[in-house]
From Swiss-Prot:
Protein name: Alanine racemase
Listed GO MF terms: alanine racemase activity; pyridoxal phosphate binding
GO biological process: D-alanine biosynthetic process
HAMAP family recorded: Ala_racemase (MF_01201)
Active site residues according to the UniProt entry: K35, Y256
Residue positions, PTM N6-(pyridoxal phosphate)lysine: K35
Record-stated family: Belongs to the alanine racemase family.
Lineage start: Bacteria, Pseudomonadati, Pseudomonadota, Betaproteobacteria, Burkholderiales
Leading EC class: isomerase
Source species, domain of life: Bacteria
Naturally occurring in which organism (per UniProt): Polaromonas sp. (strain JS666 / ATCC BAA-500)
Intrachain S-S bonds: none
Function: Catalyzes the interconversion of L-alanine and D-alanine. May also act on other amino acids.
Positions annotated to bind substrate: R130, M304
Length: 364
């Protein structure tokens, strides 16, 4: 039989979370962000759960082709725009909208010969200092784009660096408004944290919102808020089973480096999941795990193919017992991915994206 590890994608949870994002921005149209292969879930696996979105936002042409192959005929937005001039022809062919974040992309568009005018989102660098034109250069870029026959419509956008924390969005919002207040075009400012934490403040500038991580059931501002606090449901469950049991005596150690020592008799289960499956190697003793839906802890180091868990809270668990590494157990108990990520010093986004190709995936 196959190794018992499995990633399960929950389509009803995707639909629920998308509706939750929409309820926080009821007057906006929603880009469901499916970059990075839908945050590791698989574009094909999430599509049915997210098909009520007004559009899909992603990074590259290969992902856009996959959406069109699923018979999606609505808007698709390339969040990083076009990388080469030849990409513009594919944008025309696939009816893609694309971001313009630098003058070089305007140069490419000006030189592009097309019968199909492009819809573009002109991006301002309002303070995050990744992509975008600085405020003092933004209006000149807009004027130049507006004069191009290759351009049909210009929308305006920016991206917040601290919508999830105490610094907030005020400074970036002032920078954006100062330059764009009298420019026409739709606006798109809100990411996941913007939608949930600043919905009222941004409502007048939210023709489009761009929820990403919230769609996949993770809190954008954890640990201040949990996914449950925001009414989100887990969309990915990583599960496995116990494939071995050991009875330890006081002083016995576990795993590489003997990093865990039993302080008394202890029964542990060996789980078919390791860092080669995408489980974070930096997780250590105390990382939460569910066994038969009961919360317990990992002990020792994460190995390539295995972890070990304390069976004290589940004395009846043995060979074949269900183990939930994150997500929802078969009985409905939930282990938030954010909690597991926190113990590894990372974020839920990374865990979702890091599930290894060798892990089978099913949808429900």
């Amino acid at each position: 039989m196959p190794r018992p590890i499995l990633a399960t994608i929950h389509r009803p949870a995707l639909a629920h979370n998308l509706a939750r994002a929409r309820s926080a921005a009821p007057d906006a149209r929603v880009w469901a962000v499916v970059k990075a292969n839908a945050y590791g879930h698989g574009i094909e696996h999430v599509f049915d759960g997210l098909r009520s979105a007004d559009g899909f936002a992603l990074l590259d042409l290969a992902e856009a082709r996959r959406l069109r192959a699923l018979d999606w005929r609505g808007p698709i937005l390339l969040l990083e725009g076009c990388f080469e001039a030849r990409d513009l022809e594919l944008c025309s062919r696939l009816s893609l909208w694309h971001v313009i974040h630098c003058n070089e992309q305007i140069d490419m568009l000006a030189a592009h010969k097309t019968q199909v005018p492009h819809r573009v989102f002109l991006k301002m660098n309002s303070g995050m200092n990744r992509l975008g034109l600085r405020p003092e250069r933004f209006r000149a870029a807009w004027t130049r784009l507006n004069a191009l026959p290759q351009v049909d419509e210009i929308s305006l956008m920016t991206h917040f660096s601290d919508a999830d924390g105490p610094k907030g969005i005020a400074a970036q919002l002032r920078a954006f408004d100062a330059v764009t207040h009298d420019l026409p075009g739709e606006r798109s400012l809100s990411n996941s944290a913007g939608v949930l934490r600043h919905g009222d403040e941004l409502a007048a500038r939210s023709d489009w919102v761009r929820p990403g991580i919230v769609v996949y059931g993770s809190a954008p501002d954890f640990p201040e808020h949990s996914a449950a606090d925001w009414g989100l449901q887990p969309t990915m469950t990583l599960s496995s089973r116990i494939i071995g049991v050991q009875e330890l005596a006081a002083g016995d150690t576990v795993g590489y480096g003997s990093s865990f020592t039993a302080d008394g008799p202890l029964r542990i289960g060996v789980v078919a999941c390791g860092y080669a499956d995408g489980y974070p190697r930096h997780c250590s003793t105390g990382t939460p795990v569910l066994v038969n839906g009961v919360r317990t802890r990992m002990v020792g180091r994460v190995s390539m193919d295995m972890i070990t868990v304390d069976l004290t809270p589940v004395p009846d668990a043995g060979m074949g017992a269900e183990v939930t590494l994150w997500g929802r157990s078969s009985g409905g108990a939930v282990l938030p991915i954010d909690e597991v990520a926190q113990t590894a010093g990372t974020v839920g986004y990374e865990l979702m994206c890091a599930v290894a190709p060798r892990v089978p995936v099913m949808t429900e």
